[in-house]
Amino acid sequence: FSPNSPSDVARCLNGALDVGCGTFACLENSTCDTDGMHDICQLFFHTAATFNTQGKTFVKESLRCIANGVTSKVFQTIRRCGVFQRMISEVQEECYSRLDICGVARSNPEAIGEVVQVPAHFPNRYYSTLLQSLLACDEETVAVVRAGLVARLGPDMETPFQLLQNKHCSQGSNQGPNS
């Protein structure tokens, strides 16, 4: 595949349906490095059956919200990749917030755990936005999301992940590089 230019992406978005993952397929293989939303869309669709009614509505509405938001703003932002990438993340965050991703995660811990898998390719800014949206929830929801993610990392990755997550310095300790 040859990378798609921003104008190719814009043309594709203009013709994409607002249901399904077609809009997000347009973002793949772009010269602006906007890959990742298609994988998230596919994960949501593949796990949709495991969500409760509120979760199923969230899946449908959040994907539609992001697709419509990106499509409606693409022509204002397509000229500069950084602005385009930021716009996609902002639309994603707005949609998750407006549609209460925290409530959905709280009432669908298993299903959200299936969605929050470690992506095959790092870095993935849109996966990070999804995780940040979930980690901004209440402590109980964050604990469920973290536990699900750590469980899916497997034993080889669990220890380094926990080490990076924990702070081992005592509060009174001033043994940093500047002391």
From Swiss-Prot:
One of its GO terms (cellular component) is extracellular space. This is Stanniocalcin. One of its GO terms (molecular function) is hormone activity. Its primary function is the prevention of hypercalcemia. Upon release into the circulation, it lowers calcium transport by the gills, thereby reducing its rate of influx from the environment into the extracellular compartment. STC also stimulates phosphate reabsorption by renal proximal tubules. The consequence of this action is increased levels of plasma phosphate, which combines with excess calcium and promotes its disposal into bone and scales. Produced and secreted by the corpuscles of Stannius. The keyword Transport applies. It is found in: Secreted. Pfam families: Stanniocalcin. PANTHER family: STANNIOCALCIN (PTHR11245:SF7). Glycans are attached at residue 29. Disulfide bonds join 12-26, 21-41, 32-81, 65-95, 102-137. Belongs to the stanniocalcin family.
